[in-house]
Amino acid sequence: MTHYLILESRDPYDSVDWGNIQEMIINLKRNGNDVTLFLLQNGVLPARKSTSFAKYFADLEKLGINILADFFSLQERGIQEIYPSVEKSNIDQLIHLFFMPNTKIIWH
């Protein structure tokens, strides 16, 4: 089985194709792949508890998609509270994910 590691560095507020990438993530999972969504840089912005993305992240979690957010990116943007379906992570874990067997990486 292929593991897709999706690096999301763009936020939905200024990226017109953000929705298309998220649809691709869901389709990859529905087609039987393992999927990890790693939010970094401005990609962490929708993970803030005050945004309207709670249902979106909960739906991804229900599908079995792992959602990680880079701690440094959160800290740099002053984000302390994130949705429960999003786990704080770091670059060390990201590098570990790079080297998992059968992993394909997509950066957006």
Task: Please name every model-derived segment.
Residues 3-19, 41-48:
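Short, glycine-rich nucleotide/cofactor-binding loops
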Residues 77-107:
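C-terminal structural segments of small proteins and small subunits
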Residues 3, 30-36, 66:
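Residues at the starts of beta-strands that form the adenosine-phosphate
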Residues 19-23, 50-56, 88-89:
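Charged helix-capping and loop-helix junction motifs
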Residues 29, 61, 99:
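Anion (oxyanion) recognition and catalysis
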Residues 15-32:
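Histidine-anchored nucleotide/phosphate-binding helix
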Residues 40-44, 71-74:
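Short beta-alpha junction loops
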Residues 52-79:
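A glycine-rich helix N-cap at a beta->alpha junction
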